C-alpha cells in the first residue's frame, strides 16, 4: 500500500528541516556501528574499527549525505518510488550484491536519527509516516532481488 495523502503531507512538510550531511553521517554511522557486518560493503572507507572512527570518517559522512539526499529526491517521487529507485535497485543487487535486509536496517537507523534531530517535533504520527516511507524505499531497493 502506498503512502496516504496525509503521510505525504507530513513528510514533505518536515523534510525541508533536514540537514542531509548531518543526518546522513549519523544514520549511516549508526548502521555501521550497530550492524558491523554491513561494513563489508564499505571497505574503501578506511578505518571503521570503532564507533569513534566511524562517526569521524569523512567517507561515511559523504556517503550518508548521498543516501539521505537520494531519500529527499524520492520524496519528490512518492507516487512512484519503485520507478524512481529501479536503476539503483538493480545496481545494488547485481553489482554490489548488498543484502536487501540492510535497506530496512538503514531505514530504522534513519528513523532513529530523525527522532534525535527533530526531538519533540518527531511525533508518533510523523514517525509512522517516515517508517512507511522508509519501508516503501526498502521495498523499492529490494525489487531488483525478486
UniProtKB/Swiss-Prot annotation:
UniProt xrefs under InterPro entries: Globin, Globin-like_sf, Globin/Proto, Hemoglobin_b, Hemoglobin_oxygen_transport
Residue span, Globin domain: 2-146
Alphabetized SUPFAM superfamilies for the sequence: Globin-like
A biological process from GO: hydrogen peroxide catabolic process
Binding site for heme b: 63, 92
Keywords associated with the record: Heme, Iron, Metal-binding, Oxygen transport, Transport
Tissue and organ expression note: Red blood cells.
Molecular function via GO: haptoglobin binding; heme binding; metal ion binding; organic acid binding; oxygen binding; oxygen carrier activity; peroxidase activity
This protein's GO CC annotations: blood microparticle; haptoglobin-hemoglobin complex; hemoglobin complex
Function: Involved in oxygen transport from the lung to the various peripheral tissues.
SUBUNIT field: Heterotetramer of two alpha chains and two beta chains.
PANTHER family: HEMOGLOBIN FAMILY MEMBER, HEMOGLOBIN SUBUNIT BETA-1
Family the entry assigns: Belongs to the globin family.
Record-given protein name: Hemoglobin subunit beta-2
Organism: Xenopus borealis
Encoding gene per record: hbb2
Amino acid at each position: 500500500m502506498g503512502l496516504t495523502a496525509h503521510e505525504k503531507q507530513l513528510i514533505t512538510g518536515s523534510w525541508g528541516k533536514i540537514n542531509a550531511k548531518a543526518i546522513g553521517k549519523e544514520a549511516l554511522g549508526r548502521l555501521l556501528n550497530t550492524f558491523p557486518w554491513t561494513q563489508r560493503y564499505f571497505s574503501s572507507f578506511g578505518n571503521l574499527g570503532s564507533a569513534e572512527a566511524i562517526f569521524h570518517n569523512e567517507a561515511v559522512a559523504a556517503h550518508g549525505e548521498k543516501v539521505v539526499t537520494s531519500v529527499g529526491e524520492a520524496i519528490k517521487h512518492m507516487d512512484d518510488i519503485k520507478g524512481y529507485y529501479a536503476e539503483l535497485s538493480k545496481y545494488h543487487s547485481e553489482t554490489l550484491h548488498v543484502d536487501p535486509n540492510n535497506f530496512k536496517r538503514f531505514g530504522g537507523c534513519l528513523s532513529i536519527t530523525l527522532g534525535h534531530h527533530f526531538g519533540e517535533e518527531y511525533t508518533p504520527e510523523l514517525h509512522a509516516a517516515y517508517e512507511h516511507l522508509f519501508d516503501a524505499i526498502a521495498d523499492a531497493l529490494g525489487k531488483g532481488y525478486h
